[in-house]
């Protein structure tokens, strides 16, 4: 049997990935992923993270965001992270492997958070994409709705929420809901986010809960 050839789209993605300046920088600096630079740019603009904070990181693997946040909140801070994929340990991060859509996993995560409210909830969750927007966008919107539900359960008054959202059906309604719950809401497209991608980051501060 002959070798299977990669599709044009997967070959293009690989070429883009390995020539991406942020992928190269992440490799040189021994960072978990290029996502580190996305949250860094958001922090430079929006100043979300401070020493001693407690942060929930959803869709954490391979750990770029958690790695960055630990550097901002210091030894007295705490990150509680969750992902369906494995993640190598990071000092200062309490990691739970499991599917966030599973109620048992959600309950285990809430148990780790404990009684005290958290300062920031952040979500970089994304579904496995099929290439069909009619399938992918609803899957992605379901995940961001779950992330917002998490905010409603654990986020402290005046807390912050950062969430990756893919523009498409349901985006405007989701943005409206967030604006009803937070005092200040911005839509960011960090430089490290690929231009072709539909992803944007909603940064919401001043939770009214």
Swiss-Prot record:
Transmembrane segments: none annotated. It holds the Pfam family FtsJ. InterPro entries: RNA_methyltr_RlmE, RNA_MeTrfase_FtsJ_dom, rRNA-MeTfrase_E, rRNA_MeTrfase_gammaproteobac, SAM-dependent_MTases_sf. It is an enzyme of class 2 (transferase). GO terms for cellular component: cytoplasm. It catalyses: uridine(2552) in 23S rRNA + S-adenosyl-L-methionine = 2'-O-methyluridine(2552) in 23S rRNA + S-adenosyl-L-homocysteine + H(+). Coiled coil: none annotated. S-adenosyl-L-methionine binds at residues 63, 65, 83, 99, 124. Residues 191-209 form the TRAM domain. Its EC number is 2.1.1.166. It is found in: Cytoplasm. GO terms for molecular function: rRNA (uridine-2'-O-)-methyltransferase activity. Its main location: cytoplasm. Keywords: Cytoplasm, Methyltransferase, rRNA processing, S-adenosyl-L-methionine, Transferase. The active site is at 164 (proton acceptor). PANTHER family: RIBOSOMAL RNA METHYLTRANSFERASE, RRNA METHYLTRANSFERASE 2, MITOCHONDRIAL. Specifically methylates the uridine in position 2552 of 23S rRNA at the 2'-O position of the ribose in the fully assembled 50S ribosomal subunit. HAMAP family: RNA_methyltr_E. Belongs to the class I-like SAM-binding methyltransferase superfamily. RNA methyltransferase RlmE family. This is Ribosomal RNA large subunit methyltransferase E. The lineage of its organism: Bacteria, Pseudomonadati, Pseudomonadota, Gammaproteobacteria, Pasteurellales. The gene is rlmE.
């Amino acid at each position: 049997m002959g070798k299977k050839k990669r599709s044009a789209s997967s070959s293009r993605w690989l070429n883009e990935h390995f020539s991406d300046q942020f992928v190269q920088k992440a490799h040189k600096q021994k960072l978990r992923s290029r996502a580190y630079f996305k949250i860094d740019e958001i922090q430079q603009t929006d100043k979300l993270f401070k020493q001693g904070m407690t942060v929930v990181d959803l869709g954490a693997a391979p750990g770029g965001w958690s790695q960055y946040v630990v550097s901002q909140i210091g030894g007295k801070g705490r990150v509680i992270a969750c992902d369906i994929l494995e993640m190598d340990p990071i000092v200062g991060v309490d990691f739970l492997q499991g599917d966030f859509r599973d109620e048992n996993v959600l309950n285990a995560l809430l148990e780790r958070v404990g009684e005290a409210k958290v300062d920031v909830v952040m979500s970089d969750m994304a579904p496995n994409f099929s290439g069909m927007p009619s399938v992918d966008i609803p899957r992605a919107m379901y995940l961001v709705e779950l992330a917002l539900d998490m905010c409603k359960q654990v986020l402290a008054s005046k807390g912050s929420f950062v969430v990756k959202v893919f523009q498409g059906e349901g985006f405007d309604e989701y943005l409206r809901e967030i604006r009803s719950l937070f005092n200040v809401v911005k839509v960011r497209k960090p430089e490290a986010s690929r231009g072709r991608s539909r992803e944007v980051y909603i940064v919401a501060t001043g939770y009214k809960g």
